[in-house]
Amino acid sequence: MQLPSIAATTIGSFPRPSWLAQNERSRAVFRLEGAALKEAQDDATALSIHTQERIGLDLLSDGEQRRTGFINHILAAFEGIDLEHEVVKTIYRRREQPRPVPRVVGKIKRRAPAIVEDLRFAKAQTNKPIKMDVPGPMTVIDSTLDEFYKDEVAMAMDGSCMDVPQ
């Protein structure tokens, strides 16, 4: 599908419905668990996509309805990252109060595709093109505390981090 020269789109994130999550600063706290949460996330994703179609966007996103924040949903697919025992860090790009971040505790290695199923579900909701937002190496570095590599360049350039399926 050919996009117009200037495509109307959204940054990716879309407001989560109050029945799905309570939003606290830049994090969502989901109201459900297990199968009920997945069903609610599917519903919220479909709602987000259909709303984007209705308002006339050309390039749609899944609305990031499955994410508690920008990086944790993606990082859950990698070994070497502790999402359970966060530590407080001042995040440079946000220039704000210190906040809890995941810890890098070992070699980062992809154990499973991070967003393939999310993309498949989103694509099944529309005939329009879908984009998926993923954090790059610098966002991951800034949004985690490195307790393993001790070197931001080494962490960013680790080949196993770039093990992305083609």
Where do the PLM segments sit?
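Domain-level signal for soluble alpha/beta catalytic cores
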Residues: 1-166
